[in-house]
Swiss-Prot record:
Residue ranges of the region described as Basic motif: 144-157
Protein name, per record: Transcription factor LRL1
SMART domains per UniProt: HLH
The organism's place on the tree of life at top rank: Eukaryota
Reported function: Transcription factor that regulates the development of root hairs. Transcription factor that regulates the development of sperm cells.
Compositional bias ranges of the Low complexity kind: 106-133
Length: 350
């Protein structure tokens, strides 16, 4: 039976070979082929044979595991060599369900069983072996940065803006919006405060006459270059001239009446002390030195005192008013300052 099974594929293949002559013996040709081909040793029924695959492919014993095929009946050898004639002589060949089909079904079942187990293991152990989540990047709001240097710079600008706002609240009549103009107002205000403190302190010590003389000497020595009553700081041009003129006006008004000088400074928004206190200081100082100057000014027929008279102040204000109305350091025209001087003189006369 083994010989018949071995001769089956050879007989089918020999049918396609054309003999060169009619006297050629088929049995001799088959014997020559079988003797030259390296056939495997005959395996008895006790040991299973490795299958060559259902599609004619050889099984590599070194790389793939040997597939065991049960030997239920005598058709196992026929099924083993049946792959030679699948592509040629048997186009409608079907895999037998008894021998090989069961093995394929078993393999499919094992594969489908291992897949749910793998998915279940990943589902149970996903929490333990899960990859670490990436840190979410904090996005800044529009117009703000997350860099530490940018944050520090923004905080510094906010502090500067708060300080500038506080300074602007301290300066009276300060309505500038840009920083440059705001700083100019603050500088002018500080200069006039220094002047007022200087004048008041010297008036308490030596009287208003000494203050006016020192202011005149300082203005004559330094000229247009600097002003000694503004801390000795040097400014250029019209700003220095206007500061010097204002100092002379305040000194002259303080010689007559300190209250009028305070009113003049209050009109400019530069009054530091109450007018009543300044009037009391001026009255006490004038009583200790001379009679009141307004009484001498009211005497029209008598000669005017050499220090100050109403006509002198009016002539000074007229000269200042005859200009073109240039701006001084506080942004007030010289014409308006002359009007303020006239008003101060009229108040002192009353």
């Amino acid at each position: 039976m083994m010989n018949s099974s071995l001769l089956t594929p050879s007989s089918s293949s020999s049918s396609h070979i054309q003999t060169p002559s009619t006297t050629f013996d088929h049995e001799d040709f088959l014997d020559q082929i079988f003797s030259s081909a390296p056939w495997p040793s005959v395996v008895d029924d006790a040991h299973p044979l490795p299958s060559d695959g259902f599609h004619g492919h050889d099984v590599d014993s070194r790389n793939q595991p040997i597939m065991m095929m049960p030997l239920n009946d005598g058709s196992s050898v026929h099924a083993l060599y049946n792959g030679f004639s699948v592509a040629g002589s048997l186009p409608n060949f079907q895999i037998p369900q008894g021998s090989g089909g069961g093995l394929m079904n078993q393999q499919g079942q094992t594969q489908t069983q291992t897949q749910p187990q793998a998915s279940a293991s990943t589902a149970t152990g996903g929490t333990v072996a899960a990859p670490p989540q990436s840190r979410t990047k904090i996005r800044a709001r529009r117009g703000q940065a997350t860099d530490p240097h940018s944050i520090a710079e923004r905080l510094r600008r906010e502090r500067i803006a708060e300080r500038m706002k506080a300074l602007q609240e301290l300066v009276p009549n300060g309505n500038k919006t840009d920083k440059a103009s705001m700083l100019d107002e603050i500088i002018d205000y500080v200069k006039f405060l220094q002047l007022q403190v200087k004048v008041l302190s010297m008036s308490r010590l030596g009287g208003a006459a000494s203050v006016s003389s020192q202011i005149s000497e300082a203005g004559g020595s330094h000229g247009n270059a600097s002003s000694a009553m503004v801390g000795g700081s040097q400014t250029a041009g019209n700003s220095n001239d206007s500061v010097t003129m204002t100092e002379h006006q305040v000194a002259k008004l303080m010689e007559e009446d300190m209250g009028s000088a305070m009113q003049y400074l209050q009109g400019k928004g530069l009054c530091l002390m109450p007018i009543s206190l300044a009037t009391a200081i001026s009255t006490a100082t004038c009583h200790s030195r001379n009679p009141l100057i307004p009484g001498a000014v009211a005497d029209v027929g008598g000669p005017s005192p050499p220090n100050l008279s109403g006509m002198t102040i009016q002539s000074t204000s007229t000269k200042m008013g005859s200009g073109n109305g240039k701006l001084n350091g506080n942004g007030v025209t010289e014409r308006s300052s002359s009007i303020a001087v006239k008003e101060a003189v009229s108040v002192s006369k009353a």
